[in-house]
Amino acid sequence: RIQDVNVQKSAENEPYSYFVDELTAQAIQELQDRLGYTKDKATDLLYSGGLTIYSTQDPSLQTIVDEEVNNPDNYDTAKHSVTWRYTLKHDDGSIVNYSEKDLIRWMKEVKGINFNGLFSSEESAKSYVDQYKAELVSETDKEMGEQFFTTLEPQVSFVLMDPHTGQVKAISGGRGEKRYSLSLNRATGTLRQPGSTFKLITSFAPAIDLYGATLATPFYDTAYTLGNKTFKNWYSSGFLGYQTIRDGIIYSLNIIAVRCLMEQLNPHEGRLYAENLGITSLVDGDENPALALGGITHGVTNLELTQAFATIANDGQFNKAKFFTKILDQEGNVLIDTTEDQPRQAMKDTTAFLLTDAMKQSMLPNRAYAASLNVNSTSTRAHFDGMSLAGKSGTTTKDVDIWFVGYSPY
């Protein structure tokens, strides 16, 4: 049994929460890593060995997260993407499988609809599926199976972590109904491009930490080409001339981040530095200038990015993200106690202080000194009064991914 309020299911068939899904996965992995169990033995022990597991979750905070993630007022729009699987058996014995890709192709090519893959409602999606099926099925065909469901868009994930302990207090793997246990958890199981959040952990942080740069170290913001790649800033046009690392953080300046990576250190060291902060998804092909902008092969998980920034919040001390504090066997003996884990100094405390100071300013209204350009600080939408805050935003091309990662001392 997992000893915590979040596991008490109101109905036998109710799926586990995202938190419990991740707690379960981490417990099985830790039983292997710390006690040398096989995966099968760890799994059997978890589900039928009478274990007691103490969660790190704060139920009151989890309730707030769930309410805010699912509050439609927090989103500019509400669309639905479709997952559809349909199998037909023809009278000649052949079997044909269809999916939402076939549906979308039919809508564009046959119906002539300029369609981006998102429906206005679940009912609208089902209506088009039914129309498509009517054209597919003959009297002699036999339906072998069908799966249909919609997913609210845009989707979201959220991680709330205590940076001093690594304990995860609340998590959300997505908005909308969670249909089954161990379903897709967008906070821990989905790799997304991190955008400008990576400027800190692959470029600015290692430059300060390893090479003695400061927030006042300048780089020249101008047209910048390396090989066949020309780098641009996120705003429309123009350049700011000499700008410091502090400016690069506050205004999220692409060229400053790339020049810092290439002129103060190198992409290999930038990758190693991110990995030292717990990023595990980088590959050799990521060792290029685009690393400074989060242009990487596979992306990162929300959990690992939160873990990396939690290191900055914790004066440079790294804690692995934890979903439980203790595991006890059926006799009450402690098998694992994560509260005894010691943090690892992953960056100098002075580096963490400087990065925090710059990220505080990125959340306040600031404007770059340039008469012909309107370049403002990039994280102001996450700011609220009454509390000291630090953080960094990140976006990718056409706003496919939008990030904010930040912290307070409370």
Locations of regions flagged by a protein language model:
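Active-site SXXK
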Residues: 65, 165-166, 192-219, 248, ...
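Short active-site loop at a secondary-structure junction
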Residues: 151-157, 179-201, 216-219, 290
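Mid-domain, small-residue-enriched loop/turn segments at the edges of structured enzyme/sensor domains
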Residues: 230-232, 264-307
